[in-house]
Amino acid sequence: KLTDPDMNRLIFTKEDSAKLINRTVDFTRKNGGGFVQSYKMKCVNMLDLAKFISDDIEIVGKRPGEKTDEDLISEREISRTYIHGDDIHIRMEENKSEDNRLTEPYNSKSAPKMTSDEMGKLVWG
């Protein structure tokens, strides 16, 4: 069952999750804490992902309060972001440099789309 065929979510593999944890630990050891770490996740359409699992998909309609798209980093957080490769740190202090910060919110509308090969790896390993 799927609530909305237009629903998009930010997602990454468990391997990417493990790598993010390791990078976070390494970065914290070298630079100290005081930040929230995130990752430039890719967007996946839930209908496309469901098709990898089954051909029998029933659309049941949105639930109250359910969003079609997902926000990871909001407009008010942009000025406090620091980009390190595929990682995004959100700190308390403002980032004065525009060279290594986000310029727009990071969400399932702005994120790169997951390819069919990536979805296959996500589902089937």
Stretches found by the model and what they are:
Residues 1-125:
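Strand-loop microenvironment adjacent to phosphate/nucleotide-handling motifs in alpha/beta enzyme folds
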